Amino acid sequence: MAAELEYESVLCVKPDVSVYRIPPRASNRGYRASDWKLDQPDWTGRLRITSKGKTAYIKLEDKVSGELFAQAPVEQYPGIAVETVTDSSRYFVIRIQDGTGRSAFIGIGFTDRGDAFDFNVSLQDHFKWVKQESEISKESQEMDARPKLDLGFKEGQTIKLSIGNITNKEGGASKPRTARGGGLSLLPPPPGGKVTIPPPSSSVAISNHVTPPPIPKSNHGGSDADILLDLDSPAPVTTPAPTPVSASNDLWGDFSTASSSVPNQAPQPSNWVQF
């Protein structure tokens, strides 16, 4: 079921690759590209590297139609499925297989050295990813095999927490914090704080009355209009002489002396006739 869910992804595509028939390896020293007929390739076409699951596939296809010429499954790299030659970095030996299980070794080569580098790196990156996935899967299995740690409370189990400024078990409230630094405190008033005013001097008398000036008489002759004007003018009001105020009733003393020393100012005569 897991194999059916796996999808095929393309790792590398190179449009130009040459295929060579190689002679059998005479010793264990490795393959040499100089032993091949490099100027007469047996087949040319396109190379495509795909992956499905953990296995990579090197596919040799026709450039125009895309028909599959040969395929080399790779399950490990470096390994027997893909080998490098000893005398060049642009040529490799791959093991191709058909559907019946038969296999053969052929040589492939790239004209551009950069294409050979991409071919090599694509296989390395794929199997590096396969290795990381295997390690992650192994670690997860080990974690599942370990006994799980039970951190829950058992039945009847209690714990005690100590938190500041909270009423304790005996019911006593926590002590209030005292203010430290920076605060201003108001002092209470002194006991018996009554303001006493000293009595004023008995020799000072206050006169709050100002005598109005006499009304000047008219300089005109004794005409009838003057007589009428004199009749219309108000009669002078006689005011009694000011009586001195006793020193016991004076509460401000020296302030009254300043008010009594102000000279009386006579009002200016008015030219308006009062009716």
Curated annotation (Swiss-Prot):
Disulfide bonds: none
Record keywords, A-Z: Cell membrane, Cytoplasmic vesicle, Endocytosis, Membrane, Methylation, Phosphoprotein, Protein transport, Repeat, Transport
Any one GO cellular component localisation term in the record: plasma membrane
One Pfam family named in its UniProt record: DUF1681
Region (Disordered): 166-191, 211-275
Modified residues (Phosphothreonine): T211
Biased composition (Polar residues): 256-275
Motif WXXF motif 1 positions after renumbering to this chain: 252-255
Gene Ontology annotations of biological process type: endocytosis; protein transport
Metal-binding is among the record's keywords: no
Positions occupied by motif WXXF motif 2: 272-275
InterPro entries reported in the protein's UniProt record: NECAP_PHear, PH-like_dom_sf
Residues bearing the modification Omega-N-methylarginine: R180
Role summary: Involved in endocytosis.
PANTHER family, sorted: ADAPTIN EAR-BINDING COAT-ASSOCIATED PROTEIN 1, ATP-BINDING CASSETTE ABC TRANSPORTER-RELATED
Similarity comment: Belongs to the NECAP family.
Subunit structure: Interacts with AP1G1 and AP2A1 components of the adapter protein complexes AP-1 and AP-2. Interacts with the GAE domain proteins GGA1, GGA2 and GGA3.
Domain notes from UniProt: The WXXF motifs mediate binding of accessory proteins to the ear-domain of AP-1, GGAs and AP-2 through hydrophobic interactions. Selective binding to the GAE domains of AP-1 or to the alpha-ear domain of AP-2 is tuned by the acidic context surrounding the motif and the properties of the second residue of the motif itself. The WXXF motif 1, which is preceded by an acidic residue and has a glycine in second position mediates specific interaction with AP-1. The WXXF motif 2, which is followed by the C-terminal carboxyl group negative charge, allows specific interaction with AP-2.
The protein's name in its UniProt record: Adaptin ear-binding coat-associated protein 1
Originating gene: NECAP1
